Amino acid sequence: FYKKLNPFCRKKQFFTKMSSTKKYMNIISIILRSLGYFFIAFIFLVSSYIILNSGIYHTPVTFLTSSNYVSPSNKILIIGGTRGVGLEIVKKLLDQGEDLTAMVRPTSNVEKLTQLGVKQVVADALIQEQVQTIFSQNNFGTVISTLGTSAKDLPERQNFIQARIKGEVKMDPNKRPDFIGNRNIIDSAKATGVNRFIFITVIGTGQSHDALPPLSRRGHKDVISLKEKAENHLRASGLSYTIIRLGGFSNGQSSGKAKLTEDHLAFSYIARTDVANLAIEALGNDESINKTFNAYDKDMLYLHRMFMD
């Protein structure tokens, strides 16, 4: 009661409350400042990652001259046509009225191919005898392969941090179609007199090693090695080939500006539908025979373009 009446005590209580409030405000200020610094650091890291994984460091100046589509006038076999780039190529070839067949695995999801009315033959590319049978029973004149390991094939999907913590999960190379599967297809194509072979592969192989950003090169070193073996096997086969190497690709809309260049240091991202356009254009372009190209889109140099449109 005395303290309530004593003005000095009331004044002391007032300043004590003020001091507590100021302390809380200081704490809040520190938290907000820390969040601000964290946000700035996050933006810096994301921006740095995008720049490091961009194609801004080298600009090609020469490109394959564009040409109108020319039909091969024979039966076309596509491998890897159930999804991604392969499926986009299927759609483009159907639009051109081509006689098209897709080779699929027994476990493949063929729903989209069936809806499109695409003829299908079943074989596991890793089993040479099955591939040979498919080729010997059909008179294919042209082969397009987008065959490779999909994320579903991997024993475990990992990001960079998980790989660091748990150790990188590797897949048995003998169970990956990137080399063995493509080798079996190339050999069967050669044995049955195929006229033309289009191979969709990745930037980072052979002379394009330095074009791939270092982080991507490290993360995909296993598949790059296998794809490079497949490329070399195709070159040595004697088939009339065109090799098209890709950087990252997206499901975004076509920019209409993608081109093929023999400049092996060129790197960009690219829409799958643009890859399909480049592949079927190269099919009938004699200037592309027995050559290796990087797919390049000047509007898709930065990683974030993969997630736009």
Question: What is the meaning of each model-derived region?
Answer:
Residues 70, 81, 249-309:
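Active-site-lining helix/loop region of Rossmann-like oxidoreductase modules
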Residues 22-41:
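N-terminal Sec-pathway targeting helices
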Residues 76-98:
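N-terminal Rossmann NAD(P)H-binding glycine-rich loop of SDR-like oxidoreductase domains
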Residues 149-261:
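Glycine-/Pro-rich loop/turn segments that contact NAD(P) or position catalytic residues
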Residues 45-62:
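Membrane-interface motif at the C-terminal end of an N-terminal transmembrane signal
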Residues 127, 181, 230, 271-274:
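Conserved cofactor-binding/catalytic machinery of classical short-chain dehydrogenase/reductase
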Residues 76-77, 102-191, 284:
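NAD(P)H-binding glycine-rich loop region in Rossmannoid oxidoreductase-like domains
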